[in-house]
């Protein structure tokens, strides 16, 4: 798990492409101080597993699904990327829950300055926008940001100078593609509210939920279920 607080930016040294996958090598510093094989590092918000490393670089495999769903396939030698190590159990929770599993990509449609802040407008698909709420959280290229506005097929975030200067946002321009990960809590809530998505029944069908009487109920979380359980 990550928190969306970028530790440093790294530089892509090379990307070796196969038929349907790739090996990404990134030059870095801070995220390598205690790295071990098999550790997770988020690269532009995508959780990757370290397969090789040295004092100043690491490599990770990028699978077909990841290349299709994220912007990593567009990286090239010299590209700058956001980096974050997986959160330690006793670490500071500075952002929000970020899994590193990208929901899709968006396109930067507008950038404007507002005093010392910079507003970024991101156009996204309906499958991503459905989970976005004003003042809620979203990860853009692995950066935990607060949604400032929703408008039609887009949403906007307001970025402070420190965040822009210490991430890849400062180099973004109109038309650029960014990785997007919705707040996972919203996705779980929607899943639990679906009929048949009860407490039991991991496959999502034939599921039942226990009522206050101890008897099983089908249909997931419903109004009658909430009333029966004191809500």
Segments predicted by a language model, with ranges:
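Conserved loop->alpha-helix
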Residues: 1-231
């Amino acid at each position: 798990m990550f928190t969306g607080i970028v530790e440093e930016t790294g530089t892509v040294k090379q990307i070796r492409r196969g038929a349907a996958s790739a090996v990404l090598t990134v030059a870095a510093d801070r995220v390598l101080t205690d790295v071990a094989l098999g550790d997770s590092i988020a690269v532009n918000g995508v959780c990757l597993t370290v397969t090789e490393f040295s004092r100043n670089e690491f490599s990770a495999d990028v699978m077909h699904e990841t290349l299709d769903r994220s912007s990593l396939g567009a990286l090239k030698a010299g590209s700058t990327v956001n980096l974050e190590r997986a959160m330690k159990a006793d670490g500071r929770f500075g952002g929000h829950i970020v899994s590193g599993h990208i929901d899709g990509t968006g396109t930067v449609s507008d950038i404007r300055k507002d005093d010392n802040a910079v507003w970024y407008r991101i156009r996204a698909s309906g499958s991503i926008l459905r989970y976005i709420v004003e003042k809620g959280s979203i990860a853009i290229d692995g950066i935990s940001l607060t949604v400032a506005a929703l408008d039609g097929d887009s949403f906007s975030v307001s970025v402070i100078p420190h965040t822009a200067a210490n991430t890849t946002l400062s180099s973004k321009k109109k038309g650029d593609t960014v990785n997007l990960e919705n707040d996972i809590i919203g996705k779980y809530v929607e899943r639990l509210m679906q009929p048949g998505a009860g407490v039991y029944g991991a496959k999502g069908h034939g599921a039942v939920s226990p009522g206050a009487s101890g008897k099983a109920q089908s249909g997931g979380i419903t109004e009658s279920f909430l009333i029966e359980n004191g809500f």
